[in-house]
Amino acid sequence: MTEKKPTPMMEQWHQCKEKAGDSVLLFRMGDFYEAFYDDAVLLSQHLELTLTQRQGIPMSGIPVSTVDTYVDRLIGKGFKVAVAEQFGEPAKEKESKKIGPMARDIQRFVTPGTLLSSTLLQEKFNNYIVAINRIGSLFGFACLDLSTGSFFIEECENTKELVDEICRLAPSEVLSCNKFYNKETAIVMQLQQHLKLTLSTYADWAFEHKFASQKLTTHFQVASLDGFGLKGLVPAINAAGGLLSYIQDKLLLPTKHIAIPQTRGKQQKLLIDTASQVNLELLAPLNDPQGKNSLLRIMDHTSTPMGGRLLRQILISPFYNPKEILVRQDAVEFFLRQVTLRKNIKTYLCQVRDIERLMTKVTTGLAGPRDIGTLRDSFSAGAQIYEQLASATLPEFFIDKCSLDTKLASLIALLSKSLNGDLPLRVSDGNIFVDEFHNDLKRLRHNQEHSQEWIWEYQERIRKETGIKKLKICFAQALGYYIEVSSEFAPQLPKDFIRRQSRLHAERFTTIELQQFQDDMSNISEKLQTLETQFFKDLCSHILQLRTEILALSQSLADLDYIISLADLAHAQGYCRPRVDMSDTLCIYRGCHPVAKTLVDTGKFIPNDTEMRGSQTRMILLTGPNMAGKSTYIRQIALLVIMAQMGSYIPAKSAHIGVIDKIFTRIGAGDNLSKGMSTFMVEMAETANILHNATDRSLVILDEVGRGTSTYDGLAIAQAVVEYLLFTDKKKAKTLFATHYKELTTLEDHCPHVENFHAGVKDKAGQPVFLYEILKGHSQKSFGIHVARLAGFPLCVVSRAQQILRQLEGPESITRPAQDKMQQLTLF
């Protein structure tokens, strides 16, 4: 039995599906997008759509009017989507003259990392796609946010640095050539472990240097990339060219709005590796990714999407250069003092929408009237902000940033006087421009809105002109508008009246003026739509001519929003301005954990001091019982350094911070089953990374290093780590080491740069009272059994533990209890 030949339409589907690859294919058929075979089953399972069959082929459909909603749902679940459209007229076969299917082909792809306009785009988060390339031991990557056009490249010297950089960016999609994906499985697995992302591959040739560099020079219309500062960055250029080709040639997406790729100077940033970003809960709480108790949530007082994205970018990659920090501190201080000005500007900032992404929609032809209206309102708010700032003596950070370009001022005036207040979603809905924008627009709308009024007025006028009181204007579907008079009055009509029809006792006429009115009425909607469509295109073109000026305005407002957000935070929380310089000092007086402080009643959080001067103290050994605040304190120091190097005020009475180049943390651990690594192995790997990469300007936070093995092994490892960080040249980082190993505290006696501190506890009738104060000296007791009791241990177990502890601390050996002395615990 021969296999049934597919219909011409299904042949089209198979051709499109081959192009779609691993994407779900939505195939336009009339008023629906259909999915077939496995794609139909997938839609049924993930979108709860009805699964049907036709000739044994599974199929499922989505109405054209709601396709974007369903595409977003698929993308949100991590799928890629290809959309095939129908166009033209049905094809005719030459010989039989039979009507064939309409032409169909894929017109666009949608992937998680290439969203242009979607409900999935979060206002204050970039949506990145990152492409990776490797040459020898050197990695290059290119990072693009297609929704804003932001594009930059970077190179990394090793796998750890590459993974940290990509995790810091948290892309939605990672792209590589097929060869890289198949060879670098360890990198792929690490990225999948840390991030929820889509992995995509593209042709190897697109990442070859000759093609990639030519792709970039052609797109940006230059002869060489050297003028962009990209000279010699071969792996990164290859990644950028491969990414651009993937977007343009594979996904068929618009790219003319993509900015010239920038390079990022890593030496000018405080580097925070992936583990530290997670451990310090910069973006999300450890045990609650959607929770609010992160540093980002506490610090974010921004009013605009651009300002929110800028805050997040700086939080995960703060400044290193004291000059950059100082100018932002000055700006924060200025607005902290100018309370009224700050509030006024905040009011206008709240009226500013996402100018970056709106401009992308204009550039790619996706903008509707409402988008242009939103731009108008945002521009107007920006102009009001500049007007507020005009009379102020601005700090250095805002010099040359807060003056309105004259061309942009003219555009704002044009938008304000030409667009209606309440704008439609689509151009085809009409009523975009005010009547006064164009005479033809005014005339057509007037005729449309006052057609019956015009008929009555015209009827009265020609009655007076002819003297025929019974003359009337009527309408018939076949004739349209006509003038009717009794047959006896027909000779009295002027010669320019044109006879249309004769009846038994009446004659019907028209006039050139009535015909013009008839033409206007019959085509008025079409004419209005044609006119407004052209006017809208012209307006968008005019906006695009000022794209550079508009994006400069967007960046200026983002900077302003960022600074005012920090000023609001400092004002609301009573923060202080830290002194930040190139010294070897880390001194904080009455510092508080910025997140923990907000979770307790006002005045209840206990502040603590930190004093580390390179010539005196480089390492603090911190002992004390669990739950006494050790981990909170050491995290607190890292968070305050990050805030200070963002240009922010910090929760302290005063502070002097010499800039830190890198922050490392080793806090807690869990098994990494995907890599076959135990808790202890994870701990050792992270500690090894610190030992290899820390410098004498780094800050190292170590919590209980060595606890995952036997006591002596753990103690030996912990002391070796301490000595390495104390005595190895160029590795003498400022270190806070929380430990239960009392033996380490003796290092203070013969190491001049070590100081012992402990989390204070008061012993009250045998019960510990946690003071949450960090005090000089080492702890005498750990109070671990007390913590076990608080955790709900059975009292018999607690009692036995206390007995064993007394025996361990005394001269006698541990006794084995009688079987009946110990209550048997059930498993369930």
Swiss-Prot record:
Matching NCBIfam families: mutS1, PRK05399.1
GO molecular function, one term: damaged DNA binding
GO cellular component, one term: cytosol
Species name: Chlamydia pneumoniae
Gene Ontology biological process terms in this record: mismatch repair
Record-listed ATP binding positions: G624, P625, N626, M627, A628, G629, K630, S631
Signal sequence interval, chain numbering: none
Entry keyword annotation includes Transport: no
Domain of life: Bacteria
Protein name stated in the entry: DNA mismatch repair protein MutS
Function per UniProt: This protein is involved in the repair of mismatches in DNA. It is possible that it carries out the mismatch recognition step. This protein has a weak ATPase activity.
Gene this protein is translated from: mutS
InterPro entries: DNA_mismatch_repair_MutS (IPR005748), DNA_mismatch_repair_MutS-lik_N (IPR007695), DNA_mismatch_repair_MutS/MSH (IPR017261), DNA_mismatch_repair_MutS_C (IPR000432), DNA_mismatch_repair_MutS_clamp (IPR007861), DNA_mismatch_repair_MutS_core (IPR007696), DNA_mismatch_repair_MutS_N (IPR016151), DNA_mismatch_repair_MutS_sf (IPR036187)
The entry's keywords: ATP-binding, DNA damage, DNA repair, DNA-binding, Nucleotide-binding
Family (UniProt): Belongs to the DNA mismatch repair MutS family.
Pfam families, per database record: MutS_I, MutS_II, MutS_III, MutS_IV, MutS_V
Transmembrane segments: none
